[in-house]
Amino acid sequence: MTYDEINIGDILIASPGDKAYRYKVTRKNDHSHSVTVHTVEEYDANLQRHVPCICNVYTVLPENFCRKIQKRAVVL
C-alpha cells in the first residue's frame, strides 16, 4: 500500500503481530509520506464522550499496513 492510496477517514488493518488491528487515518503528512492513525475503538469511545484528546495516536508509514478495509463517509 502506498501513501497515495490512503485517504483521511480510511480504516486500515495493521500487519500481523500488532496488538491493535484496526486504525483510522486522521492526517496525511506530505513531508514524510507517513500517515497519522489511531485505534478505531479508542476513537469511537472518545467521540461518544466528546473527549477532544485522542489516545494511542501513531505516525506510521503506509507499508506497515496490509490492507484498507473501508472508508468512512465523514472526513475528520
Tell me what each language-model feature is:
Residues 1-2:
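Short alpha-helix capping/helix-loop boundary micro-motifs
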Residues 43-76:
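Intrinsically disordered, low-complexity, charged/polar segments
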